[in-house]
Design a protein with these regions (language model features):
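Basic- and aromatic-lined ligand-binding clefts that recognize polyanionic substrates
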Residues: 45-57, 157-214, 222
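A short, structured surface patch at a secondary-structure boundary
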Residues: 45-99, 113
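Proline-aspartate-enriched helix->loop->beta-strand connector
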Residues: 97, 101-110, 126, 232, ...
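Structured C-terminal subdomain patch of bacterial secreted/periplasmic proteins
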Residues: 25, 45, 140, 176, ...
Length: 309
């Protein structure tokens, strides 16, 4: 009995000695340049200013370490962001710096909207800023999950979290093969075209619709390029995918995307006549949480419900 206890004690001591104090990961700096970032290994106090990162942390079972979080309307993160003892750190666009400092985090996760605050936040704790679409949505989400898991010694748990995603995308690809589309977001009464390099790029990049709205001369990565409805008529896509930004950010008094899109011009298109205008059912997920595992599942569900039923 005594020898068994000694062995357990020795094993525990060895594990503690072999665990590193820090780990080096690939991340982005405030200029969106790739850097090697040293962060504490297995940090106990996490500040969340990015919902995709929170999504991955929850999938890894680390939500109990969150000491502060930005607010969010996403239903699946409410158990964390509104939990007792979790400080409100502002929003994913504007952080409450005093609140972040007060919660004494060991590590801070941010998204692109806070890249301008990277240096200020880095004075509080190491800031992990990960890309969301550089490698394609699925590949980048998987890569980010691997990165986050490596910080906490949970690398072995990642593969199981992505089971089934490849097959689902292949099914959608079979449907999309040879079909044309325009992808865009509705905001402030207008329609902005999105390319294959940012938001909603999974539709053209991985699912495989030919995105006829892509134009190398314009920046389509963030809010897209404002397009006239004549542009849609001219391009004559078979499908039109619409993300309602105003609904995503809960803009008061904004018109619904359907009211804006279904006008005299758009109603002349085959996409409208054939019932192929797809309004993405969970715009807040597409707009604020792309890059998370649950978010990816919901995004695929939105496409499957419209295209495969």
């Amino acid at each position: 009995m005594l020898s068994a206890l000694c062995l357990l004690t020795a094993a525990s001591a060895f594990a503690q000695e072999s665990a590193p104090e820090t780990v080096v990961i690939q991340a982005l700096d405030g200029n969106r340049e790739s850097i090697e970032l040293t962060v504490p290994y297995d940090p106990q106090r996490i500040a969340i200013l990015d919902m995709a990162s929170l999504d991955i942390l929850m999938a890894l079972g680390l939500e109990d370490r969150v000491v502060g979080s930005a607010s969010s309307s996403l239903e699946y993160v409410q158990s964390v962001v509104t939990a007792e003892g979790v400080a409100n750190l502002g929003t994913i666009k504007t952080a409450d710096m005093e609140a972040v400092m007060a919660c004494e985090p060991d590590i801070i996760f941010i998204g692109g909207r806070l890249s301008g605050s990277y240096d200020t936040l880095s004075e509080i704790a190491p800031v992990v800023y990960l890309p969301t679409t550089d490698e394609g949505t699925l590949a980048q989400t998987r890569l980010n999950a691997d990165t986050i898991a490596s910080i906490f010694g949970k690398e072995a748990e990642v593969a199981a979290l992505f089971e089934g995603f490849d097959a689902r995308i292949e099914t959608l690809k079979s449907f999309a093969d040879g079909k044309t589309a325009i992808v865009g977001l509705v905001t402030s009464g207008g329609f902005n075209v999105l390319g294959n390099d940012g938001r909603c790029s999974i539709i053209g990049r991985e699912v495989g619709f030919t995105n006829v709205g892509v134009d190398a001369e314009i920046d389509t990565a963030t809010h897209g390029n404002e397009a006239s409805f004549e542009f849609i008529v001219e391009k004559a896509p078979e499908y039109i995918f619409v993300m309602d930004r105003d609904a995503a950010i809960q803009t008061e008094g904004a018109k619904l995307a359907q009211e804006i899109m279904e006008n005299e011009l758009v109603m002349t298109t085959d996409a409208y006549k054939n019932g192929n205008i797809v309004y993405l059912a969970h715009p807040a997920v597409w707009y604020t949480a792309e890059g998370g595992i649950t978010a990816l599942d919901i995004m695929l569900q939105d496409l499957e419900a419209e295209l495969l039923q």
